[in-house]
């Protein structure tokens, strides 16, 4: 069944343009509430669902939060408001408080004038595709309102921030602390601005916080995981041991060492697999179609299974759950530790990296010295919405030619973004100059 509104990470778009309008978001709240009410009454006759709403720091969050509240209330659903908290905080609190669902108002790493809505189930996982389709179907039903005595109530959740801080700290080994470690934390002027610095500080680190003054208009603006130059500069200026940059909703990260070198999600996954192997057996790990070939080669030599999922943390999660594995990640910095959390969490991922450094007594560079990443070139080409690259004859011919030239010493990946009107062209080869040249050849054929 074709989706009308839900993408790979909920409903997302430009604020004020369909579907991110007050009217649509109110109807979305009502539709989701209607579906949740059906589930809830099936489990416990006469009961009513409660949902938790969290948001990042975008100015439009106030408007969309109010619209969701109205829609849920009209459907007879009670609402708890967490205020600005990371996406993974909503997943955790929904599960911990035994709520029916969690809702996040965020567009992650996108600019401030974008926003989005995504849902978590009662278990703290992203909604199943079937449930999202049910909500889409419910959107086609005219909105009404339950009787006045059945309207949903709305209240604030006391100390959502403190509850989540304690949860994050609980994932760090009891026998370790961060005393003697100087950390720069870039919060992207986003949802973790009042949380991440305190987590690391309470574990003993000396913390320098940047990107922690949200205005409603500056989320991800020259800061955060997608703009690491600010972090690199701050790490060097403060002579820090490590830098950690989160994105706007704090579900992913990048790390920088004392020299200013940036470490990718692929390198972090390699570090974490090796660290886990030092304390327990590791059956396998999950990457994506974009994961560097070097990991595949290294894991094979280590006797560890490796599977590529489609790009998107929800698909990495599905592949892990299917196999009963615990560790997965994307090069963009989405990391999954299923023995720690049900979803990607930038703060918890940082704590796992820090625990590996503490446990080994080594630096990031030392922990990755035995793996040489294949050079990758990724080019994003802006296209019109709905553009189908698979019907572009020139691109397909050039792709086939490049693959023939690479043979077994590289690969080509072309895919459409699930959240933006972009075609991503990636070429991986043992030679960086070759990868760059071939990626540009393919990208040049894109006519839209």
UniProtKB/Swiss-Prot annotation:
Post-translational note: Activated by phosphorylation.
EC numbers on record: 5.4.2.10
Entry's Gene Ontology molecular function annotations: magnesium ion binding; phosphoglucosamine mutase activity; phosphomannomutase activity
Alphabetical list of InterPro entries matching this protein: A-D-PHexomutase_a/b/a-I, A-D-PHexomutase_a/b/a-I/II/III, A-D-PHexomutase_a/b/a-II, A-D-PHexomutase_a/b/a-III, A-D-PHexomutase_C, A-D-PHexomutase_C_sf, A-D-PHexomutase_CS, Alpha-D-phosphohexomutase_SF
Record PTM Phosphoserine, positions in chain: 108
Requisite cofactors: Mg(2+)
GO CC terms of this entry: cytosol
Reactions that this protein is recorded to catalyse: alpha-D-glucosamine 1-phosphate = D-glucosamine 6-phosphate
Key words of the record: Isomerase, Magnesium, Metal-binding, Phosphoprotein
Details of cofactor binding: Binds 1 Mg(2+) ion per subunit.
Enzyme class at the top of the EC tree: isomerase
Annotated positions binding Mg(2+): 108, 247, 249, 251
Tree of life domain: Bacteria
Residues annotated as the enzyme's active site: 108
GO biological process terms on file: carbohydrate metabolic process; peptidoglycan biosynthetic process; UDP-N-acetylglucosamine biosynthetic process
Described purpose of this protein according to its UniProt entry: Catalyzes the conversion of glucosamine-6-phosphate to glucosamine-1-phosphate.
Protein family according to the UniProt entry: Belongs to the phosphohexose mutase family.
HAMAP family: GlmM_B
Protein name: Phosphoglucosamine mutase
Organism of this sequence: Herminiimonas arsenicoxydans
